[in-house]
Amino acid sequence: MNTKILSKDKDPMGAAILDYQKSGRAGRLRVLSSMFEEDEMPVKHLFRKVEEMPMLEQKALQLTKGRILDIGAGSGCHTLALQEKGLEVKAIDISPLSCEAMKLRGVKDAECINLFDPHLSSGNHSEEHQKTLSEENQKQFEGGFDTILLLMNGTGIAGKIENLPALFLRLKALLNPGGQILIDSSDLKYIYENEDGSFDINLNGAYYGEVDYQMIYKDVKGDRFDWLYVDFPLLKSIAETCGLHGELVAEGEHYDYLARIF
């Protein structure tokens, strides 16, 4: 699992986001994969407003509560929507260019930091320290989150199915008591579906939701990276091995879904 920060010369999506933020337009953001034909991500889509978001994203925003952590925030579209509702949101991304764009857009708390960086912590303190704090300051320094958002295929950052438990345990450590994780993904089995409704999936091979991608923007070429799509039953099962519960909140039109983990 990637635990680093992107360098600017290896950050095509960040470059595209910052270009669009500064000029209102951007070039082609190319998406390559060994599994699919070359595709293109519309940069304007990364700046969508609430009413332009897919139903699953809108539902996730409706379910947020308390102090929120938006992971892989990109251009900050989800964070800004929540800020407008008066909610406290911390946006993080491993792209320094995306974080620069977020700040230009008005995101109040945007930090270029990796989710697994120990400096991003729940902020839990010893009982002795907590006793020295007023009730208001305890809340301020507690540092945990009531809602953690991972949208636009939030399971992707795990990269491989074997890394999903580590991701869930890290998120669990960042949650306040009673907190929740809102995460979306897709079941890629439709790629292997036959006309008769059966599926040609190699059960002895790698998990079928493991994909590799590479992005290119102008002369900025990113490194190839692993990206994970997970079917809900497996996501729920892995969450349970981590001492968490998984709940299917809503399903989209094409094997995509929103889950709540708590």
Question: Where are the regions a protein language model picked out?
Answer:
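N-terminal auxiliary segments of SAM/dcSAM-dependent transferases
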Residues: 1-31
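Conserved SAM/SAH-binding beta-strand->alpha-helix loop
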Residues: 95-96
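Conserved SAM-binding strand-loop segment of SAM-dependent methyltransferases
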Residues: 106-119
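A short SAM/SAH-binding and catalytic strip from SAM-dependent methyltransferases
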Residues: 145-165
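A short glycine-rich, Lys/Arg-flanked "PGG" loop and its adjoining helix->strand segment in the class I
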Residues: 164-177
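SAM-dependent methyltransferase
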Residues: 177-236
